[in-house]
Amino acid sequence: MPSYTVTVATGSQWFAGTDDYIYLSLVGSAGCSEKHLLDKPFYNDFERGAVDSYDVTVDEELGEIQLVRIEKRKYWLNDDWYLKYITLKTPHGDYIEFPCYRWITGDVEVVLRDGRAKLARDDQIHILKQHRRKELETRQKQYRWMEWNPGFPLSIDAKCHKDLPRDIQFDSEKGVDFVLNYSKAMENLFINRFMHMFQSSWNDFADFEKIFVKISNTISERVMNHWQEDLMFGYQFLNGCNPVLIRRCTELPEKLPVTTEMVECSLERQLSLEQEVQQGNIFIVDFELLDGIDANKTDPCTLQFLAAPICLLYKNLANKIVPIAIQLNQIPGDENPIFLPSDAKYDWLLAKIWVRSSDFHVHQTITHLLRTHLVSEVFGIAMYRQLPAVHPIFKLLVAHVRFTIAINTKAREQLICECGLFDKANATGGGGHVQMVQRAMKDLTYASLCFPEAIKARGMESKEDIPYYFYRDDGLLVWEAIRTFTAEVVDIYYEGDQVVEEDPELQDFVNDVYVYGMRGRKSSGFPKSVKSREQLSEYLTVVIFTASAQHAAVNFGQYDWCSWIPNAPPTMRAPPPTAKGVVTIEQIVDTLPDRGRSCWHLGAVWALSQFQENELFLGMYPEEHFIEKPVKEAMARFRKNLEAIVSVIAERNKKKQLPYYYLSPDRIPNSVAI
């Protein structure tokens, strides 16, 4: 009788093993085997991290094996099991791989396809078509869209982490408990001793150093020492944790009535301000989005304030970007003066602090939350709903949505919900952050997620004109490496544009993103369908780049740039100044966050800047969803390209007092998971 050798690999994460009964049956083109209990006498089967082998003898020839059925039945208590893969050695000596990489929970039957990626058109056998359809029907019941707030991209229909499908939950929920992590952060940073003085002001700038430990020889220390300097202020718009707002100014806005006479002491080329604009030396950052946003009112004991500044910047003869004019609100007038570097020291400093605070709010809520977290969740939900596990695009993307839906669900549960942690320290808490996302949706376009196009749209593409924009330089390298990789994978499975156009599952995936993620907005520019291999490759590059590189660029620098409180105040306790010549150091300190909010803020940016335990970085694919040699070779080339980028960035950083490493591929996690 024919005999098969079955190898079963159990996951190595905590509680991956099981004591439940595991049965296996084989489905072939010529018949189906009986159920076989996988059990070895005097042996503990399916332990965490184990690879177990079993001989399975069948009564008759089964033909080509098409499916493997796994049944899990309760032994004593339900015991979840994480199955990595099954391999089958046939009586003819052939090896067949059946990837799984998911949790098997309860008393269930799981059906596995072999690991070869297949488009829908490749499945001509009824049982395979049926399996494909049933998998998507089941997933669409599990992964349901929900509107968390009006106007937001839709998210997963789950009130809390434990409501999620087991496959997308964190291995340990404790590791992503925001309350626990923030408390741990404050303990690690030795700042919980200040919490009893929650609403008291600091005495002066030096007083902030009491909560600033463990920073020797770090970017944080450099920020603390140089934050008041105009060069450091300008540098952050290029290479800080929000390097996406600065744009070349092609015309001075009417709402900022700045003149040459006002700024001539800052201009170094003996040109008028208008001539500097024409020569491309003037840049602008406009926080119009914040105009009219409600400030946090959740604490009746502390008034909090927001501004909507406009900041004009200048490229000096050293090609460095420096601020030359700041107006703290959108409508010009006598009580909304334009602050200048030539003003009194504390006037100018407070104006810059207001800009830094506004930048913090836009960074946290729009650049970070909306444009990486929420967008990546949309891609993840659409993928699970519309692409079966056998689809090549599912196999390509699944690593890049790992834990994303889970981290966002935890954020909605603890962080950005009503009365959540975000409300404790941020002026945009208490609902302002919701208003911001609703406003910013109109600017969330497909083109703005295409990295090269986004850089060009802001007039920031020239390396000769703007030589110190490392976010742009490194981002373009990583974008091109991802684009090359996705193009290779697409070409393996789609031999022509027509195959792309005629792939119904792919088109449903793209349409789901448009309809539910972008809420069917034509102005978003998101495609409803893809019609060519080139377009598909670009689309996949957007998905992967957003989840990996873009998130890394705007997330992991938060402690570096935001931990020195005066450089990134999460709230301001007095309104913007309405006149010049009245600001004192005491007024600035009383405007900055109090001790308690400073501590909450510091704990938050520390916790958010940490990599996950056992982090998987860009190009690492330990779960082998693909088994075909051409794709594995493409992955190897991808990793080689990424290693070359790591070397280029490391070599440049050797010469820099202020290194930029957020887009070094060895520091870019595969997915949004923190």
Swiss-Prot record:
SMART domains: LH2
Mutation effect (residue 254 to K): Decreases arachidonate 5-lipoxygenase activity. Increases leukotriene A4 synthase activity
Record PROSITE patterns: LIPOXYGENASE_1, LIPOXYGENASE_2, LIPOXYGENASE_3, PLAT
Binding site for Ca(2+) 2: 18-19, 44-45, 47
E.C. code: 1.13.11.-, 1.13.11.34
GO CC annotations on file: cytosol; extracellular region; extracellular space; ficolin-1-rich granule lumen; nuclear envelope; nuclear envelope lumen; nuclear matrix; nuclear membrane
CDD domains in the cross-refs: PLAT_LOX
Binding-site residues for Ca(2+) 1, renumbered to this chain: 17, 79-80
Database matches in Gene3D superfamilies: 3.10.450.60, Lipoxygenase-1, Domain 5 (1.20.245.10), PLAT/LH2 domain (2.60.60.20)
Modification after translation (UniProt): Serine phosphorylation by MAPKAPK2 is stimulated by arachidonic acid. Phosphorylation on Ser-524 by PKA has an inhibitory effect. Phosphorylation on Ser-272 prevents export from the nucleus. Phosphorylation at Ser-524 is stimulated by 8-bromo-3',5'-cyclic AMP or prostaglandin E2.
Cofactor note: Binds 1 Fe cation per subunit.
Biological pathway: Lipid metabolism; leukotriene A4 biosynthesis
Residues of the site described as Essential for stabilizing binding to COTL1: 103
Stated role: Catalyzes the oxygenation of arachidonate ((5Z,8Z,11Z,14Z)-eicosatetraenoate) to 5-hydroperoxyeicosatetraenoate (5-HPETE) followed by the dehydration to 5,6- epoxyeicosatetraenoate (Leukotriene A4/LTA4), the first two steps in the biosynthesis of leukotrienes, which are potent mediators of inflammation. Also catalyzes the oxygenation of arachidonate into 8-hydroperoxyicosatetraenoate (8-HPETE) and 12-hydroperoxyicosatetraenoate (12-HPETE). Displays lipoxin synthase activity being able to convert (15S)-HETE into a conjugate tetraene.
Alphabetized SUPFAM superfamilies for the sequence: Lipase/lipooxygenase domain (PLAT/LH2 domain), Lipoxigenase
Family that this chain belongs to: Belongs to the lipoxygenase family.
Compartment(s) of residence: Cytoplasm; Nucleus matrix; Nucleus membrane; Cytoplasm, Perinuclear region
UniProt activity-regulation remark: Undergoes a sequential loss of the oxygenase and pseudoperoxidase activities which is dependent on the structural characteristics of the substrate for the reaction, on oxygen concentration and on exposure to phospholipids and calcium. 15-HETE and other 15-mono-hydroxyeicosanoids exhibit the highest inhibitory potencies in their capability of suppressing 5-lipoxygenation of arachidonic acid, whereas the other HETEs, (5S,15S)-dihydroxy-(6E,8Z,11Z,13E)-eicosatetraenoic acid (5,15-diHETE) as well as octadecanoids, are modest or poor inhibitors.
Residues covered by the PLAT domain: 2-118
Protein name as annotated: Polyunsaturated fatty acid 5-lipoxygenase
